Curated annotation (Swiss-Prot):
Gene3D superfamilies to which the protein is assigned, alphabetical: Fe,Mn superoxide dismutase (SOD) domain, Iron/manganese superoxide dismutase, C-terminal domain
Note on cofactor: Binds 1 Mn(2+) or Fe(3+) ion per subunit.
Protein name: Superoxide dismutase [Mn/Fe]
Family: Belongs to the iron/manganese superoxide dismutase family.
Binding site for Mn(2+): H38, H90, D172, H176
Source organism of this protein record: Rickettsia felis (strain ATCC VR-1525 / URRWXCal2) (Rickettsia azadi)
Annotated keywords: Iron, Manganese, Metal-binding, Oxidoreductase
Signal recorded as keyword: no
Enzyme class: oxidoreductase
Residues binding Fe(3+): H38, H90, D172, H176
PANTHER family found in the cross-reference section: SUPEROXIDE DISMUTASE (PTHR42769), SUPEROXIDE DISMUTASE [FE] 2, CHLOROPLASTIC (PTHR42769:SF3)
InterPro entries in alphabetical order: Mn/Fe_SOD, Mn/Fe_SOD_BS, Mn/Fe_SOD_C, Mn/Fe_SOD_N, Mn/Fe_SOD_N_sf, SOD_C_sf
Length: 209
């Protein structure tokens, strides 16, 4: 099973994917400098690290990124897992956001949100609580699991695909995601994420596929 074709990569050596938009287009909420560091340095470092870790592991070189995440999780190889998962998580995150995004969705995703959270406002409140409440580095996710939407958080490089959960939306709450523009104000960043950044088409596409 492939969880997300936009996040998965088929084989070694892995590459840094291009951003699916112009980094200038998130002004005034985010400066291009944030993307220069977050994408160009942090995400790229995970790619380089994973390629170095796999350079002498021919069997793993034949696996796609999601298979490497599964293998490293089952075999307790933290170094490979952390870098592979962070590549996948970041690739998924870049598609979870878009310029002039956010706000209230429509269609099937709104129907499911209303069913599972009572209202869109209820979803926003719970998502913000989980994202802000993640202690230290990590991620907040909207997933579809056990036939319903759930909001979960993962620490560090944790990813829902390692636990068989279907991710729909990711919010990066590592400090490198927001510190240049928001310093230590994670609640402000999460507010902006919900109101102005979520790519609801991507979320719905993940739900219905």
């Amino acid at each position: 099973m492939t969880y997300c074709n936009k996040s998965n990569q088929t084989s070694y050596p892995f590459i840094l994917p291009d951003l699916p938009y112009d980094k200038e287009s998130f002004k005034p909420h985010f400066t291009p400098e944030t993307f220069d560091y977050h994408h160009g340095k942090h995400h790229n470092a995970y790619v380089q690290n994973l390629n170095n870790l796999l350079k002498d592991k021919e069997e793993l070189q034949k696996k796609d990124l999601e298979e490497i995440i599964e293998w490293s999780s089952q075999n307790s190889n933290a170094a490979i897992f952390n870098n592979a998962a962070q590549i996948w998580n970041h690739s998924f995150f870049w598609h979870s956001i878009k310029p002039q995004g956010g706000g209230k969705p429509s269609g099937k995703i709104l129907e499911q949100i209303n069913k599972d959270f009572g209202s869109f406002e209820g979803f926003c409140e719970q998502f913000k609580q989980e994202a802000v409440g993640q202690f230290g580095s990590g991620w907040a996710w909207l997933v579809y699991h056990d036939n319903r939407l759930q909001i979960i958080k993962t620490a560090n490089a944790g990813t829902p695909i390692a636990n068989g959960m279907k991710p729909l939306l990711a919010c990066d709450v590592w400090e490198h995601a927001y510190y240049i523009d928001y310093r230590n104000k994670r609640p402000d960043y999460v507010d902006i994420f919900i109101k102005h950044m979520i790519n609801w088409k991507f979320v719905e596409d993940n739900l219905i596929k």
